[in-house]
Regions:
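C-terminal beta-strand-loop-alpha-helix "lid" module of Rossmann-like NAD(P)-dependent dehydrogenases
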Residues: 1-313
Length: 313
């Protein structure tokens, strides 16, 4: 066997082995997407309705509550960026991190300092490599988050939000500086093909006209009675609201991660098929050239023997 043919066949074996890995990862991601979609569908209504409930309570409450009352001159904001723990998911993590950088740049342009809270090793490694400050980080569950994970993240964010600016709160994760706003950056799962990075403000809650004026269409404004008080109701809703928003964002990001990884692995598998076909053609051409050379050598040797025999006679 010629040296060139051996090289081609060695490369084919290597590509085939890689194809088996990418194909297996594609199938695993495809099987996990279904469950991830179901979890997103199950959590979204609760998160949406809780947000509407908070908006309704805040709209008809005369109390100034941190949940809905914006600081006149905000000086620091917390930004939660949700990425992946593992790679091989295309541009999924990079897109979320880039969206976070755009949000941070916009906040800094408004004169607002930022505290970065990160979920996923990709974001953590990105920040550490660039020597950026990290207020809090969580890893190891990006592709399968639970409500307990979301609650842990939400508690850190709430602690920072309820701490006055300039003060520091001591937690298990370390010292947290007080912030005036909470923002979250995650990847919204729209379909198997489309997943978009999204930046949204969680606190103070931005009341939309559709939320505040749901009753306007009927011409009647609802009357609310708060027991024991509107402030205590909002205090009770605050952690639930943040936990629900964070959990839903984590689930959306997990589903997006699986979809992105499946798409990336399918592309890698297809590329491996094309490369195998190309190497097969090159190997066949090399084999044909080798056979042609062997035939030429045999014919040449036969002619030489025939000429030698004729000369001896």
């Amino acid at each position: 066997m010629g040296a060139q043919l051996r090289i081609y066949r060695r490369r084919m074996r290597s590509v085939k082995a890689t194809k088996k890995i990418t194909r297996a990862m594609e199938l695993i991601s495809a099987s996990r997407i279904v469950k991830a979609q179901q979890r997103v569908a199950a959590s979204s209504p609760y998160s949406t309705e809780l947000t509407r409930a908070v908006a309704a309570v805040a709209s008809f409450s005369s109390d100034a509550h941190p949940l809905t009352t914006a600081v006149e001159n905000p000086r620091r904001a917390a930004v939660l960026v949700i990425s992946a723990d593992r790679g091989m998911a295309g541009a999924y993590s990079n897109a979320a991190i880039k969206e976070g950088d755009l949000l941070i740049a916009d906040l800094k342009a408004r004169g607002i300092e930022t505290s970065a809270f990160l979920v996923g090793r990709k974001a953590v490694n990105f920040y550490r490599f660039r020597n950026r400050d990290i207020a809090g980080s969580w890893t190891g569950f990006s592709d399968n988050p639970t409500f307990e994970h979301a609650r842990e993240v939400a508690q850190a964010l709430i602690t920072a939000f309820l701490t006055e600016h300039g003060s520091v709160a001591t937690t298990e994760k370390g010292d947290l500086a007080g912030v005036d706003e909470l923002h979250i950056v995650y990847t919204e799962f729209k379909s198997m093909i489309t997943q978009l990075p999204v930046a949204a403000q969680m606190l103070p809650l931005q009341l939309e006209k559709s939320d505040a004026n749901d009753s306007a269409t009927s011409g009647l404004k609802p009357q609310y009675e708060f027991e024991p008080s509107s402030e205590q109701v909002l205090n009770s809703l605050l952690p639930r609201y943040v936990e629900a928003r964070v959990f839903n964002a984590m689930l959306q990001s997990a589903a997006s991660e699986h979809a992105a990884r499946r798409r990336a692995m399918k592309s890698a598998t297809d590329n491996a098929d094309e490369l195998i076909k190309s190497l097969t053609r090159l190997a066949n051409a090399a084999r044909q050239a080798e056979i042609t050379q062997e035939i030429s050598e045999i014919v040449g040797g036969a002619d030489a023997l025939a000429s030698a025999s004729a000369g001896s006679e």
